[in-house]
Amino acid sequence: MPKRRLSATLACYTRRRTLRPCVPAGDEHALEALEALRTAPPVNGDHGHNWGVNEYISRGISGQENYMNAYRNAARAYQCALLWKITGDEGYGDVAIDVLNAYRIYNKGLAGNTNVSLIPGFIGYQFINAAEIMRDYKKWPEEDFELFKQYMIDVWFTTAQDFLERRHDTVEREQNWYHYHSNWGLGNALFCVSLGVLCDLPDIYNYGMYWLKEGPGNESLCVTALHPDAFGQGLCGYGWGLIPWFHKDERGPLGYLNQMQESGRDQGHAMAALGLLSSAFESAYNQGDNAFCNLTNTLIPGQAGAAMVAGAAEYVAAYNSGTDDLPYKQNWWMGGLNATGRGQWRP
């Protein structure tokens, strides 16, 4: 199993080591960053608003949706956890623990239509972020921490696992793994990676990494590497795999700009694909598992895992920040790059 007690996601412990000593020293840039964190929603300069805990977190059914409360509370817990770790202010630590304990006690399940599968990957891993930071908080009893971990397994993991393996029966019905855009699988795989780290469970950690590195779905880099249309010859029906197309372009790392499966959707979705993947692999890196470099791609020389993702990062960032003359491979999903949401700051 990878090393324990490093951040499950986003390398926040690495950031803490670089930021925390600078704050009391009066480092101007560190203080500006801290103030930006402290005043950003949902904390908004104090300890934030409590949106309440729903017995069942629901997404996708009109009139029953309440998942917004969960993602706001998850962000609040994570933000307060970071602020406690950086400043030592137990007021923030108490808020983070209160939120985590409340969900462990009152939330009984996830609900909705097929969109229920978006809840673990877009909300659940943020609760895990907060818990990972707070695991050594002296005012969070070990018993409560253990109960929280079991809650995440019992209530959240089952939903993530069900999507990854069945995809709402589309695998059996359509005889392929490509019905859903890559973000669906990415989020659920990220959740599993994060949960495995939090709970020190190698099986769950490796299960999440399997779907990213070796799995058959659109979230997989392995499918990308085996994709017969990766060189851009002809129109691919669905754009299989996470990064289906490699465009030879001197502006990209090692001479390639890499088009992701989510490229062509609005910028919220396009940017989320890169963010979810980066979070999962940075989590792995923090555990001593260099997931990028352990991947190989035999189709294009030099396009190992790190170069594949770097080329995709350059591609996604270039378009979002204003570059228009990017190569694009049309596919069944989308006919071109989508400017909706372009240039916006995203959480």
PLM feature spans:
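Active-site-proximal alpha-helical scaffolds that flank and shape metal-associated catalytic sites
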Residues: 150, 179-192, 203-206
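Extracellular glycan-targeting catalytic surfaces
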Residues: 1-174, 186, 190, 210-213, ...
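Long, repeat-rich segments with strong aromatic
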Residues: 196-328
